[in-house]
């Protein structure tokens, strides 16, 4: 979608963007405020290319530091009482699985990656937010911890599980487009190695996007043929 928007294949007449914090000029961020949700990676592209961009916020401040959306991309700022509940970004899928079959699958996947030599110093990976992929991350962390190694960067959607690995030194950075829980949202504001990026930087195939550097991706699915 980011590629289609940037190429002109998809045209946006007006973009209404909820932002947890903004200033009167339109600089906006998801890092802070009572509704802090983390990265605004998808909103970055829409707000830049839309004919008209409207920022809707429940935390209007004098100045925004580390903005995701700059005032040069914004036409209107609309203060409201509430843009939503940030607790809603943390769904029941975001956590280690307790299903014994999924745990075994995750364990086997982690062991396969280790035996194949993929889990090593500096390797780059992406996690889905489902229970099985996050459980794979647990096994990866154990392997890295045991060997005293660290991965390179991880690509988010970021979760508290990923940010925990970052804080422990098991990975060196997180590139984040969409933050999946409130723990990760807090990390984005406080940790300089937790880096916000646009959806285009994440996966636009016409650019040198971060997915070009992935060694492995772990995704969960409800059904696979």
Task: Describe each model-derived feature in a short phrase.
Residues 1-225:
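Conserved alpha/beta enzyme-core scaffold
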């Amino acid at each position: 979608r980011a590629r289609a928007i940037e190429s002109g294949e998809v045209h946006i007449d007006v973009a209404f963007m909820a932002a947890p914090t903004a200033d009167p000029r339109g600089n906006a961020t998801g890092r802070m405020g009572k509704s802090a949700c983390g990265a605004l990676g998808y909103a970055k592209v829409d707000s830049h290319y839309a004919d008209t961009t409207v920022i809707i916020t429940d935390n209007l401040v004098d100045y925004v530091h580390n903005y995701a959306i700059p005032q040069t991309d914004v036409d209107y700022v609309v203060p409201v009482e509430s843009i939503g509940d940030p607790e809603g970004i943390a769904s029941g899928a975001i956590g280690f699985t307790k299903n014994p079959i999924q745990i075994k699958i995750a364990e086997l996947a982690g062991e396969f990656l280790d035996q194949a030599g993929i889990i090593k110093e500096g390797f780059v990976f992406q996690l889905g937010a489902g229970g099985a992929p996050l459980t794979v991350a647990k096994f990866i962390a154990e392997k890295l911890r045991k060997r005293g190694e660290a991965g390179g960067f991880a690509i988010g959607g970021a979760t508290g599980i990923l940010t925990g690995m970052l804080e422990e030194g098991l990975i060196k950075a997180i590139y984040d487009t969409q933050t999946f829980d409130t723990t990760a949202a807090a990390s984005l504001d406080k940790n300089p190695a937790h880096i916000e990026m646009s959806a285009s930087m994440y996966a636009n195939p016409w650019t040198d996007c971060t997915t070009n550097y992935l060694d492995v991706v772990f995704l969960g699915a409800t059904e696979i043929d």
